[in-house]
Amino acid sequence: MKILKYLIYISMVSCHLYANSQVTQEIVNLKTRDDVTMRVLLLSPKEPKASLILFAGGHGGLRIFPNGSMQWGENNFLIRTKSIFAELGVNVAIVDAPSDRLRPPFLSGFRNSEEHSKDIKALTILLKNKYSVPIWLVGTSRGTESAASVGIKLQDENDVKGIVLTSSILIGQDGFPVPDMALNTFKKPVLIVHHDKDECRVTKFSDLSKLSSKLNSNNRNEVVIFSEGITQGDACQAMSHHGFNGIEQQVVSKIVDWVIKN
């Protein structure tokens, strides 16, 4: 390491072209379970090299509007950088809380559930049929709980090429920390991205070895540490080092380069 069958009902709510690129945007309402749908914001370049399913942090209840804006979470690292990902040549699929979780606590307490994995499984089927490129799960902060848990559950179905974990949840507090998951059984590549000045109480850089030591040593894994940028506000919020404020382009470029090479 480097330091069940699914009935898919799709409703296209909106589609438009980004003004300065060949990136299109769609809103997809995807049937994932009986009487449950999940709204997905999908950005697609002309010739995508991979598809990235992005999991925002916090409670995860974005409440995506038909025009692609959100009621909550627009400053989240993965949300505010979505166009950077797409312009670098990968599909971006941003997942909202499913229709049966669109009220508090949203995804809190749900990210490690079988239902969450079923929702994402339905999305992987859509992406495979639509694009036929490798699919990666990318999470930030609380979203790393989703990326890791879903990745582990779906790995034997060959739906997911690997996972990317940024500002990972490292200790237990109101959730299920990633080091407590069975990552030693995950047989696919893992990229860990962290900031060495992350002082959020559940993602402190000083605790990162709790996660890196749990990875399967047979995988093509890598740990990437960033040091630059600026920090504003609470240490656990999106515009602090926890959210890679000021170095978004560098971080996203590293992630995209890594998933394409792997």
Regions found by a protein language model. Name each.
Residues 3-15:
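Sec-dependent N-terminal signal peptides
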Residues 21-47:
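N-terminal cap/lid segment of alpha/beta-hydrolase-fold proteins
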Residues 45-84:
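Short, surface-exposed "cap/lid" segments of acyl-processing enzymes
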Residues 77, 103-130:
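Alpha/beta-hydrolase active-site loop
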Residues 82-103:
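Conserved alpha/beta-hydrolase
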Residues 125-185:
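Primarily recognizes the serine-hydrolase "nucleophile elbow" in alpha/beta-hydrolase
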Residues 162-226:
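The feature captures the conserved acid-bearing segment of alpha/beta-hydrolase catalytic domains
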Residues 218-262:
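C-terminal catalytic histidine-bearing segment of alpha/beta-hydrolase fold enzymes
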